């Protein structure tokens, strides 16, 4: 009912809004970490993994779309790199979203997601401290993108920390790497968000709206 909808904008909604704001600050500073940051706080608050990941990816449909447009406008996108990442990343994210929403027991994998989030935190911190790196040829981009998309959907985040950090670690140009990975992330987030809604329904609208507004 309308009264129930209005009642949903309570203190809990404010918490989700603040999580969205903080996650966006982290992502804006490092060029990655929105999903990992927001999912970590949502899980700590007691939100189930499937609802957390659904909320994050639906919110990312908006945030990554805006980011992709911005990077395109400033000429930060390597179209060849985007092509290599796009389809494998989308397929991996669809597979991960389907498993989490319709196959895997969310409570059973909570400990594994917690460990995964700690790993992502280490990756993000390392990326922030990286100095000049000798460029090396990056092989098997399709496998990297598939793995990044899959783990992003199951864990609620990780596309940036996994894909961007790996590419930067091989000495790729930061400007084009971050721009291209962020552009591909829009399709990855859109695919997983739609998959979550198809197989799990629209759950936790407070989480979704709070993160989007944040």
Go through each PLM region and give its residues:
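Small-residue-rich packing faces within the transmembrane alpha-helices of Major Facilitator Superfamily
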Residues: 61-64, 114, 118-121, 186-190
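Hydrophobic alpha-helical segments of membrane proteins
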Residues: 154, 158, 189-194
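A short secondary-structure junction motif
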Residues: 65-68, 190-197
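Transmembrane helix-bundle signature of multi-pass membrane transporters/permeases
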Residues: 24, 53-61, 178-186, 211
């Amino acid at each position: 009912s309308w009264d129930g909808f209005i009642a949903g904008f309570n203190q809990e909604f404010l918490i989700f809004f603040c999580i969205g704001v903080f996650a966006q600050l982290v992502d804006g500073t490092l060029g990655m970490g929105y999903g990992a940051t927001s999912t970590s706080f949502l899980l700590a608050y007691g939100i189930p993994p499937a609802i957390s990941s659904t909320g994050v990816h639906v919110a990312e449909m908006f945030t990554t779309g805006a980011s992709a447009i911005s990077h395109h406008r400033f000429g930060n996108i390597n179209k060849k790199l985007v092509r290599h990442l796009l389809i494998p990343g989308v397929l991996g994210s669809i597979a991960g979203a389907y498993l989490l929403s319709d196959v895997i027991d969310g409570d059973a994998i909570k400990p594994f997601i917690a460990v995964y989030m700690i790993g992502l935190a280490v990756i993000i911190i390392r990326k922030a401290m990286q100095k000049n790196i000798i460029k090396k040829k990056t092989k098997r981009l399709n496998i990297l993108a598939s793995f990044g998309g899959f783990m992003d959907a199951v864990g609620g985040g990780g596309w940036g920390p996994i894909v961007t950090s790996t590419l930067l670690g091989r000495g790729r140009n930061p400007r084009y790497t971050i721009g291209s990975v962020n552009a591909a992330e829009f399709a990855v987030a859109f695919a997983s968000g739609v998959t979550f809604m198809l197989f799990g329904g629209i759950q936790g609208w407070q989480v979704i709206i709070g993160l989007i507004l944040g």
